[in-house]
């Protein structure tokens, strides 16, 4: 399979590129990335010289470039996105142009080409918050911040191309990822580094917000399964069933680094901060996937990565 991976120099995208090239000897990967704040060529160290890998620096909003690349692949996996929630609250425009309009350009190029699979990478945030129970793939979307709203818009656009153009679209919605190659502004890498140098760890509100956490390698395995075995037109939740409050995650990081809990600093909560996300995962588990890494093991690996 020849795969175009957009946003492939970012956190999850680069881990996916590494995973595919390591697990599938016959696959070829073209990585397209604009190398904005979250993308780095360093994330592709170890695969950049692989003869089955090609890196292209460019933007998914560049229609001519996208059309050219799509004409020569079997599948598209679209990770390309602006994903920093706080920045989306400060200014939504780049989130709309990349996450929605960029996806539109990819979909139109795919529809003009001969694509076997179009995997749209989404997020559990499109569902909004849930105080009890878990979200299924059939639940309505209720995004509560500009980032989530643009991802929901991209999902609906992708679904519409499957319905109206018979484009072979699949959508995944994943819980919070952590692991190697994540941007240092994100919670876990930021807190690991702060704890290591004795700086405060700013926790929103009282730290009671709950997230479901999955180690990035487990997520990459799930994405690979959906790409190859998922049913066209379907959405797949990807979760770990490991829920932790932000305060629990913070305390686990301090313990793993060997730092004192006095470094915890409670700060004003952010606007639109959803209380809890949780996902039902029966559909992806029916494809034979399940997470391998416990949170504690994944965190140990993550701490080792950032400190060494």
Model regions: which residues?
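Proline-centered turn/helix-capping motifs that create local helix->coil transitions or kinks
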Residues: 116-119, 128-131, 166, 182, ...
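C-terminal substrate-binding subdomain of Rossmann-fold SDR/epimerase-dehydratase oxidoreductases
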Residues: 16, 39, 58, 195-308
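N-terminal Rossmann-like NAD(P)+-binding domain of SDR-like oxidoreductases, especially those catalyzing
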Residues: 1-177
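Residues in well-ordered alpha-helical elements
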Residues: 64-67, 86, 93, 104, ...
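A glycine/serine/threonine-rich, flexible loop-to-helix segment
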Residues: 47, 133, 184-192, 253, ...
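The catalytic Tyr-centered alpha-helix of NAD(P)H-dependent dehydrogenases
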Residues: 132, 143-150, 180, 184-188, ...
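A structural alpha-helix within SAM-dependent methyltransferase catalytic domains
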Residues: 21, 70, 107, 111, ...
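Short aromatic-enriched loop/helix-cap "lid" or pocket-rim segments at secondary-structure transitions
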Residues: 41-44, 131-133, 182-185, 249-250, ...
């Amino acid at each position: 399979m020849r795969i175009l991976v957009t946003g492939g120099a970012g956190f999850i995208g680069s881990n996916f590129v590494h995973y595919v090239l390591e697990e599938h000897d016959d696959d070829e990967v073209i990585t397209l990335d604009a190398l904005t704040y979250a993308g780095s060529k360093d994330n592709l160290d170890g695969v950049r010289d692989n003869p089955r890998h090609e890196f292209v620096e460019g933007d998914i909003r560049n229609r001519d470039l996208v059309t050219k690349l799509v004409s020569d692949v079997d599948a598209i996996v679209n990770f390309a996105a602006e994903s920093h929630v706080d920045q989306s609250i400060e200014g939504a425009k780049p989130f709309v142009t990349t996450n929605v309009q960029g996806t539109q350009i990819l979909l139109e190029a795919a529809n003009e080409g001969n694509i076997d699979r179009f995997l749209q990478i989404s997020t559990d945030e499109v569902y909004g918050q849930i105080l009890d129970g878990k979200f299924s793939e059939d639940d309505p979307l209720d995004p509560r911040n500009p980032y989530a709203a643009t991802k929901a818009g991209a999902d609906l656009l992708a679904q519409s191309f499957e319905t109206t153009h018979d484009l072979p679209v699949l959508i995944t919605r994943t819980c919070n990822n952590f692991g190697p190659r994540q941007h240092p502004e994100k919670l876990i890498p930021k807190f690991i580094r702060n704890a290591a140098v004795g700086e405060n760890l700013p926790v929103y509100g009282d730290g009671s917000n709950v997230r479901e956490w999955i180690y990035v390698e487990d997520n990459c395995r799930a994405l690979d399964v959906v790409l190859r075995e998922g049913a066209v037109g379907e959405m797949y939740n990807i979760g770990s069933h490991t829920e932790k409050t932000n305060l629990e995650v913070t305390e686990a990081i301090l313990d793993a680094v060997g730092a004192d809990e006095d470094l915890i600093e409670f700060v004003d909560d952010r606007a639109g901060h959803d209380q809890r996300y949780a996902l039902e995962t029966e559909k992806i588990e029916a494809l034979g996937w399940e997470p391998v890494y416990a949170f504690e093991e994944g965190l140990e690996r993550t701490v080792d990565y950032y400190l060494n």
